[in-house]
Amino acid sequence: MGWLFYTDGRVQTYADEKAEIARLCTFEGERRKTELVKACKVGSTWYAAAKVTNIDGTPVEDTTYVTDADGSITFAAVFLTRYDDGCWGYKDMEESAGPVESRAPLSLLALLSELKDPDSYAHAWRQRCQDWAAIPDYEEGDKIKLAAPVTLTGGSTCQIVTATHYRRGRQKRRCYRIEETGGLVRLSKASLAGSELLSSAKGAASPVLAEFLAGRN
């Protein structure tokens, strides 16, 4: 399915978006009904867990999902969203179609029904979401070895860095100090996948104090 944009301006805020996602995940036909269980927004993408039940109370039979104990199945849907000339639009995809965007929170994944095929697109998508969630959020002063060298502008590379920050106005922004040069670089979360913590700042002396003492030796 392609993009669908709303030209009536009814979706303008986060609350509007969430309400529309809930509406899109709610449906009742002659045999089945679908309802939203949970929705989370990561960046501009909405991730939704939707539960399907049979109206007559019999267990839902599905080729992709294992039926839950209550007779329902719960699947994930991904909604790409953006604004174009002030109009909100979305493009949706069910997890079994293998969406590219794969940053659904673990709390949402925990609500989903088990999959019958371990080699399915949905299984691979869930694994990518889990891999993303496993990327650590490093603390100020943590020394890190990246899984592979990162190529910087100019052709140089870096692999061992220390988490720090810089300020833009009143905002603190995460960056990393390069071990070899002392220069600062911003790294995407994806580039931290598979990284190794070499030393932790927790319980250590202040980085500022440590630098001061090192200069006196």
Task: Report the location of each language-model feature.
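Negatively charged, low-complexity tracts enriched in Asp/Glu with abundant Ser/Thr
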Residues: 5-43
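Amphipathic, interaction-prone secondary-structure segments
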Residues: 31-81, 150-167
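Basic/aromatic-rich interaction segments and small domains that mediate binding to polyanionic partners
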Residues: 150-190
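Short coil-to-beta transition motif at edge beta-strands of beta-rich domains
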Residues: 135-150
